[in-house]
């Protein structure tokens, strides 16, 4: 049971590139989750998903990666987008996309997952239901969909051509991935899972201190409304209810879970989530925390040295567990 922490050191040219990205983000609109913004964003996301699929699928195919769409059984079938590598897969990765529980899709994660497929991993990405106050879809729906996807993946690992499974998620997907790992352990299905990767995950829906104190200068998010935005995920719960382990994995029993890798930017108001969760995980299992200085939430999407370094670190960590 160990926590190993590493701070990334950027050379001056890399640091300058990181700061240029931050300067651009400082001029960009902040993410907010009022109802009309969610509806508009989800309509745009559907269009982007279709457009991205027309671009990424042929690109993946040129590198020998094939795309398969399957659907789970049950009352609410869940679409799974599977990236099959060119050869026999080294392992399967269950990928849960980010997007604040309101945006994103499995298809839009092709760009983030391509490096894993090119590296020989079979990636199963989950199209879970997104939050919609208008349709009364909340966090419990997303959790249920991810569990259904996990059970399908565990059951079909042999069909996918591998004997080892990893679970990965970024941002909101990190939150859902952690809850999924706990659920698999509770069902006695965790032995197949050799590790979890959480990239700037959210682990406390009541809001850690760094979330509560986020100001208007926060990059990507609208800092002053972050705590309220989290509360919208489960409107039937008060603050104590948001701290319950069925929705906030920071407060869950973490014993019996596999090793985990945490990556987080130190300019992210959710950085404290990763720090606290990695500390707790390391008390129960093995955990590695990679701290990336001067980068905000979502840095995998922005390119540059932070994103390249994170992708390499993830591949290296996964390789060490095969």
Predicted regions and their residues:
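Hydrolase active-site cap/lid region
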Residues: 182, 186-240
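Catalytic nucleophile-loop/oxyanion-hole region of alpha/beta-hydrolase
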Residues: 105-106, 112, 119, 124-164, ...
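Short beta-strand element of the alpha/beta-hydrolase
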Residues: 90-100
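Catalytic active-site module of serine/aspartate enzymes centered on a nucleophile-bearing elbow/loop
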Residues: 303-322
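Proline/glycine-enriched tight loop/beta-turn segments at coil->beta junctions
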Residues: 75-78, 84-92, 121, 255-257
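A glycine/proline-hinged amphipathic helix-loop "lid/cap" segment
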Residues: 1-82
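Short beta-strand/loop motif that positions the catalytic acidic residue
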Residues: 262-264
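Gly/Ala-rich beta-loop-alpha elbow adjacent to hydrolase catalytic centers
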Residues: 169, 173, 177
